[in-house]
Design a protein with these regions (language model features):
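Intrinsically disordered, low-complexity regulatory regions
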Residues: 1-110
Length: 110
């Protein structure tokens, strides 16, 4: 993989890449019936961490085997790792929002 200059790095379109990642993850999550959220609900946050570790291990293996240059598999694994990180963040945010909602609800049953 070639190295970038600082000027080349500054030209990266973060918004476009983030939007594409979000669309990719949303489509895949819907296609799999929200399996990630169901599994995290059942097995806890360790499930999310194990999925990210699995992808990180795959990336390390591809690098070790010298298969990271121009390898779709390497790029796909990076996208999957990002996707699991995004899903984990969304899960955490949803849990925080649910907790906050519980705190602010007024209990009318007396």
């Amino acid at each position: 993989m070639s190295k970038l200059t600082e000027k080349e790095f500054e030209k990266i379109d973060y918004v476009r890449t983030s939007t594409e990642l979000g669309e990719f993850v949303a489509e895949k999550d819907t296609m799999y019936g929200h399996a990630f959220f169901n599994m995290v609900n059942e097995y806890g946050i360790d499930y999310a961490l194990s999925k990210m570790e699995e992808k990180l291990f795959r990336l390390k293996q591809l690098k070790k085997l010298g298969k990271m240059n121009h390898s779709e598999s390497f790029k796909d694994s990076v996208k999957d790792l990002q996707g699991y990180a995004l899903l984990t963040l969304l899960y955490i945010q949803a849990c925080e929002e649910a907790e906050e909602k519980k705190k602010t609800q007024v209990n009318y049953t007396k």
